[in-house]
């Protein structure tokens, strides 16, 4: 496309959705991606109940359903000591999402479908094009990108606005020094697909261990997404053998290994990470960040695809406003407002994610929290509803919820302490002689 209004770098959910929203309003949009679709992507491949609303708006929900997407009714979480709790999306708390179930679908299907919707709206999509740098004018304003084609050709492409939807290791974010790597938690993930895993149900599963965690979820057509997330310091243990490491990790878990005895891995093992990246702001003059390029903390809550879609929905109106602005100052103000609205939208969820990330990193804390949530189903439902993006984070980020969690944890520990006291007392007694 010649003279686009917006260049979108990245054709994943964030980029495709942004292109769809923009093109539908008459903007000239060029989407660039270094991959050729369909392509696989290491991801939990889970879309929360609220993500279905945006898919429906894009007329993408029906094609995804027809492609065989799996449906999830909630989440089951197992702590390191074996305590398990379950949260359901449909629950007594009364909050309801756009859908009563989450959706799980292979990225090979999802991304191709969303890109097709962007094309149908009028966006130009170029595959096999890698963005290598940004173009800036004399004042430092972004005016386009430099690209490298599969044939080795270099090209400069210009546009009034650029969208960085190029993921966790965003080239644009790095070039503009917008990204910050957090020190905690530093994790990486190994992701693959199996068929034939036993006892797979209509729930997503998270199995937390002392040295990482595993996620298991059906993604339709008999395939099951399996992700093992480990501390980044354990990367050396992979030793170039991702599949072997993942197999050994699962085999070492007595509660998981039997379920895989007749399973067959059907896709290569992909690696991604380290995670915990956050842009100190999601815009700069002439450019805006969306999706993982703007923020990605940890995959445990599986919010990445919803955040990408919702972020694109927030960004598109700001880009249109920026394009029609009467001055550079007003154009930048529109991007600043996007950043503010994004922070307002996701701030509560970010706090919940970080609290969960802390619990996952400390086995004692995770065991204690799991014990409370296993006894308080209504609290587990609320927490899973927040993760499902339809229960407001304030429902768990309040004194009442935290107090109930702590009190229940203390009450749950009390019988154990009494048992220990009795055991210790009995250990010091001399058994009475039997009566004759």
Can you name each region flagged by the protein language model?
Residues 14, 37, 169:
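Conserved Rossmann-like nucleotide-cofactor binding loop
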């Amino acid at each position: 496309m010649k003279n686009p209004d917006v260049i979108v770098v990245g054709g994943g959910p964030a980029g495709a959705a942004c292109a769809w929203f923009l093109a539908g309003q008459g903007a000239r949009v060029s989407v660039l991606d270094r991959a050729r679709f369909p392509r696989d992507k290491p991801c939990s491949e889970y879309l929360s109940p609220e993500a279905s609303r945006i898919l429906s708006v894009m007329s993408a929900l029906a094609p995804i359903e027809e492609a065989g997407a799996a449906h999830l009714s909630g989440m089951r979480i197992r702590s390191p000591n074996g305590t398990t709790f379950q949260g359901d999306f449909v629950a007594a708390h009364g909050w309801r999402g756009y859908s009563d179930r989450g959706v799980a679908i292979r990225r090979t299907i999802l991304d191709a479908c969303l890109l097709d919707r962007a094309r149908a709206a009028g966006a130009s999509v170029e595959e096999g094009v890698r963005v290598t740098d940004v173009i800036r004018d004399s004042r430092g304003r972004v005016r386009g990108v430099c690209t490298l084609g599969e044939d080795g050709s270099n090209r400069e492409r210009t546009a009034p606005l650029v969208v960085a939807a190029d993921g966790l290791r965003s080239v644009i974010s790095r070039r503009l020094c917008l990204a910050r790597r957090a020190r905690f938690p530093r994790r990486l993930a190994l992701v693959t697909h199996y068929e034939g895993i036993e006892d797979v149900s209509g729930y997503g599963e998270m199995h937390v261990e002392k040295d990482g965690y595993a996620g298991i979820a059906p993604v339709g057509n008999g395939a099951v997404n399996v992700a093992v997330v480990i501390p980044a310091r354990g990367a050396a243990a992979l030793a170039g053998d991702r599949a072997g490491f993942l197999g050994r990790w699962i085999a070492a878990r007595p509660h998981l290994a039997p379920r895989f005895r007749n399973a067959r891995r059907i896709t290569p093992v992909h690696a991604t990470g380290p995670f915990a990246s956050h842009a100190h702001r999601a815009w700069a003059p002439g450019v805006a960040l969306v999706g993982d390029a703007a923020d990605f903390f940890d995959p445990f809550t599986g919010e990445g695809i919803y955040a990408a879609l919702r972020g694109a929905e927030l960004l598109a109106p700001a880009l249109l406003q920026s394009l029609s602005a009467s001055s550079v100052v007003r154009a930048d103000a529109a991007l600043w407002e996007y950043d503010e609205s994004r922070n307002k939208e996701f701030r509560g969820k970010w706090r919940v994610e970080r609290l969960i990330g802390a619990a996952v990193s400390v086995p004692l804390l995770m065991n204690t929290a799991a014990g409370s949530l296993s006894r308080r189903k209504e609290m587990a439902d609320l927490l899973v509803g927040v993760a499902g993006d339809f229960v407001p984070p304030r429902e768990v980020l309040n004194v009442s919820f935290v107090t109930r969690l702590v009190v229940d944890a203390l009450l749950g520990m009390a019988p154990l302490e009494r048992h220990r006291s009795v055991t210790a007392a009995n250990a010091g007694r001399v058994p009475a002689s039997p009566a004759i």
